[in-house]
Amino acid sequence: MGVWHGRSLRKPTGGRIRPHRKKRKFEMGNPPTETLVGEERKLKERRGMGGNVKKGLKFATHANVADPETGEVKCVRIEEVVKNPASQYYERHGVITKGAIIRTEIGLAKVTNRPGQEPVVNAVLIKEEEEEG
C-alpha cells in the first residue's frame, strides 16, 4: 500500500469529509530509507518534484569523520552501530540515522547528517566517556 500525505477523509468527530478532488501525485510519500552498514555502498534513488532525483544511502561502508580537536576529516570504515537514540528498533537492527553513535576504525563517532536523505555519512569523533554518560 502506498504512502499518502493528503488530508484525512475523516473529521475529528469521526464524520466523513467528502473530497473535492482526487488524490494527486505530489501528495505521495515514500517509506524511509533505513541506512544499514553493508559490505558494498548502495544508493536508493527516488523521484522528486519536477523530475528531480533524490539519492539516499541504503548501505554504507565508510563515513567522513571530523576530529573536533585537530579539525581533520578522515574517510574511515564503519564497523557497527553502537547506539541509536531515535529508536530501539533501529539500534537493534543497526540502522544509521542522524544522532546515531557508530564505531569506526578511529573510535566512536556521532552521525551529524541524514544518510537516508543524502548519499554520504558525516560524523564527529566523540570520546568514549561521552557515549557512556
Curated annotation (Swiss-Prot):
Keywords, sorted A to Z: Ribonucleoprotein, Ribosomal protein
Coiled coil: none
Any Pfam family the entry gives: Ribosomal_S8e
NCBIfam families assigned to the protein according to its UniProt record, in alphabetical order: eS8
Span list, region Disordered: 1-34
Family to which this protein belongs: Belongs to the eukaryotic ribosomal protein eS8 family.
GO cellular component, one term: ribonucleoprotein complex
A single MF term (Gene Ontology): structural constituent of ribosome
Protein name: Small ribosomal subunit protein eS8
Quaternary structure, from the entry: Part of the 30S ribosomal subunit.
Superkingdom to which the source organism belongs: Archaea
HAMAP family for the chain: Ribosomal_eS8
Gene Ontology terms: biological process: translation
Ribonucleoprotein recorded as keyword: yes
